[in-house]
Amino acid sequence: MAKWQRSFFQPVLPLGEDGRRVTGSKEHIALSRMAAGEGMVLLKNEKNTLPIRKGTKVALFGKGTVDYVKGGGGSGDVTVEYIRNLYEGMKIKEDEGKVEVFDKLAKYYEKDIQKQYADGAVPGMTVEPELPDEILNEAREYTDTAIITICRFSGEGWDRKCEAAQDGYVLDGEEKRNSELSAKIFENGDFCLTNAENIMVEKVKKAFTHVIVVMNVGGIVDTKWFRDCDEIQSVLMAWQGGRSEEHTS
């Protein structure tokens, strides 16, 4: 069993001739961040809504604002020292003078998601909270630019509804748990928006002049809801870019 020792003790012992931990070195963090940015795909950008102009005020909508998914489940998961979500990344950009963020809305999502985590939820497997009209109206008074983030968590055997079990494939403990949880959270399947996400998106579309969507997903998802929608000007397929994706310029 000695050969498996590194799998059970994270982070592993320092590597490299100078004793640095190569896997978590500053050089690799910078490379990972660059790769995350280069891997993103701008699916839609009407009226040159992106890039956001310097000094723009923004309101961040959707649980994905703080419920960031860095990668896949099972063998697609990795151990990292920290994870930076969209809100945290945007606050860094605010400190740099590039944007201004409506904090009250982001804090609302942060409080809700932290409670769901405390109750046993994992990133990407959380319920979209109801968007209070009071906060929506305050956000609309603050800015005319909204950023909606949709997130999904993917893993073997449970991130899509299928008939695999009929072919003799048996889900293990974690797969079975996640499959059951996914069916409960994503009543339309995680390929589509949930009912709560649809309601949130419709509210934002009606309230804001400029609407940007960020897709923090690891697999194929439905695009009909934004493809031919004039109220949504820009869509960024951000995928799942590791621990610092949301700090990508």
Language model features with spans:
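C-terminal non-catalytic regions of proteins with extracellular/luminal or membrane-system context
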Residues: 1-249
